[in-house]
Regions:
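Active-site loop-to-helix "anion-binding N-cap" substructures in soluble metabolic enzymes
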Residues: 1-154
Length: 154
């Protein structure tokens, strides 16, 4: 039965000229039919260079949002609309705005694993591989790194 469903998805994907991107933590049945597998940033970069105009993002909401930001001309489908990342939901844009108003001397650095709304109110967005280099390049000493405290501590 699962194989039948996978076959139907593959058939529809071909008919619609779509591409399936899957985050590496997806289940094996999804990874088996994915065209590309990777982390959130890798998949966003892959999507940008694809010829297909329809991208099916098997991951969480911020990943689909990031794909759409980097490829605004593409149709991006998130199969499970309520798929969220607990880390991406740890802080709201309103909290960041309030913090920045109370502490204008701070620069707010957001990890890529955040919502589009949160990225929009931050000063810079980084990946795990670019975080250290970018933070070191910020002349201000006061930096709030959100939402990954482990990466921020590094």
């Amino acid at each position: 039965m699962l194989r039948d469903l996978q076959d139907e998805i593959i058939k529809l994907k071909q008919e619609k000229q779509a591409v399936i991107l899957a985050h590496s933590y997806q289940s094996a049945d999804i990874l088996e039919i994915a065209d590309y597998i990777g982390d959130s940033y890798q998949l966003s970069v892959v999507a940008k260079d694809l010829q297909q105009s329809t991208v099916i993002m098997c991951g969480v909401r911020f990943m689909a949002e990031t794909v759409k930001m980097l490829s605004p001309e593409k149709t991006v489908i998130l199969p499970v609309k309520q798929a969220t990342c607990p880390m991406a939901e740890q802080i709201s844009p309103e909290q960041v705005i309030s913090f920045k108003q109370a502490h204008p001397e701070f620069k707010v650095v957001a990890y890529i694993n955040t919502t589009t709304a949160l990225k929009a109110v931050c000063d810079v967005c980084v990946t795990s591989s670019s975080a250290l280099k970018i933070v070191k390049a910020i002349p201000e000493q006061n930096i709030l790194f959100i939402p990954d405290k482990n990466l921020g501590t590094y």
